[in-house]
Amino acid sequence: RRQRQMCIRDSDDTALKSGDVVLFDIGGRNRNYCSDMTRTFFWGEPDEETARIYDIVRRANEAAEALIAPGVRMCDLDRAARDVIENAGYGKYFTHRLGHSIGLQDHEPGDVSLVNEQVVEPGMTFSIEPGIYLPGRTGVRIEDLALVAENGVEILNAYPHDPVRLD
């Protein structure tokens, strides 16, 4: 994945230092169905730009999630999140689609992207995962799973969007 090459590295035995950003992308299975969630944490106090980026990504996530309902197009969800990021001046650093469908596989057909005009329907489950990645410097992503209901959406992740310091 392009974002991995830009700012995310696999774990190793490097000691964390104050200001480091730690991104957890985790998932599991229950009755053969997959889950997927990403949260970004800080080791110590984040620098000013990283804190600002975190807030932008959180607002982008929440803008897309607020729009999810039957009849809305996938591309409109991506546009809602992307507009928040672009209006903040970080558009070129949001380098991937907004999300992906999920079910028996962790990535199923049905991208939440600018090019997918598919209409959201009840029963669909997909991720909402905006991110900003500054090459060699920092990166933030917040990912939730959304289950579309008849009259809206149920966010399947219970973990909050508030920034968390791990130290």
What are these regions (language model features)?
Residues R2-D167:
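Active-site neighborhoods and metal-handling regions in enzymes and metal-associated proteins
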